[in-house]
Amino acid sequence: VSLIAASIAGGDLTAASLAWGAAAGVAGGIAVWWFYLALANGPMSVVSPVTAVVVAGIPVLVGIATGDRPGLLAYLGIVVAVIAVGLVSRESDETVTGVGHPRFTSRIAWWTVGSGIAFALSFIGLGQVGTGTGLWPLASSRATATLVVWLVIAFSWRAVVWPVRSLLPILIGIGAIDVIANGALLFAYQHGLLSLVSVIAALYPAVTVLLAVIVLGERVSRVKLLGLLAAGVAVALVSLPG
């Protein structure tokens, strides 16, 4: 899907942009692997918000350290956004495990923080891509991320649960949406500050919760509702001048 989109969008094929895209893809593939390992073996109520806050925080620090200078309101928005990410990402352990409280062991902590760092590095990698390169860096990113996934599958072949054929159209649709979302993110990085784009992108759990309420009619906890409100405030603050 990403190759088709890149061919249609055009743009310059440069070694640097493809390399940054490839690096972002490797980091993203590792991030997804470790994140689901942590979710499968640890308490989601800890794993999810910790990962989300790490993902939101590291690119902000890197962006500011490398020259980003957001305005005062944007700085306030960044702080509110990081808090919002933690709130909307929080889940009860029973939601996923159906049991009490899995232990947050040192191995789970490594997977949790490691996945957050890897996601953040993926954001930072995309943020280094120059303008005029179209979606080719995204195609490069998806290629290396897919390679990581297949390597993981190869080393855990007996434990793999393959999707049924009836899910294929849904999976293709998800792939197309993923390309659209990440293409938009790539263009946002090319025309915005790493710190601001990353922290807004990290608010995606808020959109997931909002869609669950609107489309599925789910009820949200007070904590998540507070997180949704904080996310709205954060976006408004980052968008305002000064």
Question: Where do the PLM segments sit?
Answer:
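Glycine-/small-residue-enriched transmembrane alpha-helix faces in small-molecule transporters
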Residues: I30, G86, T97-W136, G173-I177, ...
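C-terminal transmembrane-helix exit sites in multi-pass transporters
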Residues: A9-G10, A56-L76, G86, V152-S156, ...
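Hydrophobic residues within alpha-helical transmembrane segments
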Residues: A19-V26, V50-V54, L76-V79, W110, ...
